[in-house]
């Protein structure tokens, strides 16, 4: 009898471990990973796909199995330990009452220890670390267990849904296991800390989250910095501008910057006349080299701008303000840089970074850097409803700003480092000494 009890007790512990490992494994593994295993022809992958596709039902089966085996462990464990320990207490002439209490306590402690450690904690750790292997091994057995006890599981699930419904709540579903953006950011941060992803991967994904929140105005090249050519410029004038400015593309004006009719590609333009004589160069027609641009309101999300640029097959979007005037432009490169970071080509060798770190707590910032980026960099809480950039913020705080003008805010000293006319080019930022 004692041997049979021990076998049953051990079997119940093993079954508990099976259900616990299955529960954690099927929750941990990704559906995309199972799809990959199916393509590789892994044994058990199709069964695993069925399980994670109907996650609610099979989690209920696991929970039922854990509950039943736990009750069985308590029931069998008490009688098993009583058979083992009773002769020992009798040998030492311990009274029946005392020995019965001691046996109950010892049985409870031992059964709890074995159930928690061997039946739950160890399988849980194993399932989390080896989710793929455990899922493939346990998928078919849990499917058979579910089929055998389907009526009972269906009744229990229905009862649970009814009780939850009394409180005006809907039962959880596997389709509701999706994570919010904030949860995904936390998961990514934890993955980075544990070494699962590197810093660049973390940065790219965070940039993608911020991508939809950016509007075109925040990343544009402002009107005053647009280098353009006139539709009436001569060949020599255009070549001189290209040599001086070294940009890839140039907007073409029909009068002023409020009338941008397209753009030229410097490489295509120069290639067209590289082997031609002077007469052809003098008689060239600029309209033959003009590519179309799109015009969008400056407040449109950059995602929408990129989609429109792809649809229209153009590299430049002209931004207009609410009055119809040109406020700036964005290129496809500007938009992509919001995800992958700075993209430098052969013309960018002399380009100055927007944020230059002099030393700890000492920076020189381009006035076009966004206020929110400054807050992220410094840990400040600067804000303005009227402007987006740090240069604009400074001008709203001090309307007669000039080189050397200073503002103190949030523990930092903001100083005008360089200006061009009335425009602030760079700000110097230093942390205040305590």
Swiss-Prot record:
Domain CNNM transmembrane: 1-201
Annotated transmembrane regions: 7-27, 64-84, 101-121
Pfam families hit by this protein: CBS (PF00571), CNNM (PF01595), CorC_HlyC (PF03471)
Topology in the lipid bilayer: Multi-pass membrane protein
Entry keyword set: CBS domain, Cell membrane, Membrane, Repeat, Transmembrane, Transmembrane helix
InterPro entries reported for this sequence: CBS_dom, CBS_dom_sf, CNNM, FAD-bd_PCMH-like_sf, FAD-bd_PCMH_sub2, Ion_transp-like_CBS, Transptr-assoc_dom, UPF0053_domain
SMART domains referenced in this protein's UniProt entry, alphabetically: CorC_HlyC
Protein family membership: Belongs to the UPF0053 family.
Protein name as it appears in the record: UPF0053 protein YrkA
Species name: Bacillus subtilis (strain 168)
Annotated gene: yrkA
């Amino acid at each position: 009898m004692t041997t049979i009890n021990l076998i049953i007790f051990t079997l119940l512990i093993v079954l508990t471990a099976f259900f616990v490992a299955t529960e954690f494994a099927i929750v941990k593994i990704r559906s995309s990973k199972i799809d990959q295993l199916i393509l590789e022809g892994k044994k058990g992958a199709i069964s695993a796909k069925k399980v994670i596709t109907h996650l609610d039902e099979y989690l209920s089966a696991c929970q039922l199995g854990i509950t039943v085996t736990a009750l069985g462990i308590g029931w069998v464990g008490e009688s098993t330990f009583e058979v083992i320990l009773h002769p020992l207490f009798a040998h030492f002439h311990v009274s029946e009452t005392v020995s019965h209490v001691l046996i109950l306590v010892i049985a409870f402690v031992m059964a709890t220890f074995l159930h928690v450690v061997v039946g739950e904690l160890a399988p849980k750790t194993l399932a989390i670390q080896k989710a793929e292997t455990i899922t493939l091994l346990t998928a078919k057995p849990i499917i058979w267990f579910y089929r055998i006890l389907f009526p009972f599981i269906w009744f229990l699930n229905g009862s649970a849904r009814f009780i939850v419904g009394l409180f005006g709540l809907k039962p959880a579903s596997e389709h509701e296991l999706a994570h919010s953006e904030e949860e995904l950011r936390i998961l990514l941060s934890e993955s980075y800390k544990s070494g699962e992803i590197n810093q660049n991967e973390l940065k790219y994904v965070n940039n993608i989250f911020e991508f939809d929140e950016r509007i075109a105005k925040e990343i544009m090249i402002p009107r005053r910095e647009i280098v353009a050519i006139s539709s009436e410029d001569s060949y020599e004038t255009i070549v001189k501008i290209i040599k001086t400015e070294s940009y890839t593309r140039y907007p073409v004006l029909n009068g002023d910057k409020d009338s941008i009719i397209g753009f030229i590609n410097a490489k295509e333009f120069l290639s067209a006349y590289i082997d031609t004589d002077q007469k052809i160069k003098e008689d060239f027609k600029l309209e033959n080299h003009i590519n179309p641009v799109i015009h969008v309101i400056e407040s449109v999300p950059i995602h929408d701008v990129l989609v429109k640029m792809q649809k229209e097959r153009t590299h430049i979007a002209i931004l207009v303000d609410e009055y119809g005037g040109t406020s700036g432009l964005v290129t496809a490169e500007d938009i992509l840089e919001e995800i992958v970071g700075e993209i430098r080509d052969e013309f960018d060798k002399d380009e100055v970074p927007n944020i230059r770190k002099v030393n700890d707590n000492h920076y020189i910032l381009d006035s076009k850097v966004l206020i929110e980026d400054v807050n992220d960099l410094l840990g400040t809480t600067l804000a303005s409803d009227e402007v987006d950039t740090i240069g604009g913020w400074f001008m709203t705080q001090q309307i007669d700003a000039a080189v050397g003008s200073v503002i103190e805010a949030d523990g930092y000293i903001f100083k005008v480092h360089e200006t061009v006319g009335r425009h602030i080019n760079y700000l110097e930022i230093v942390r205040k000494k305590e």
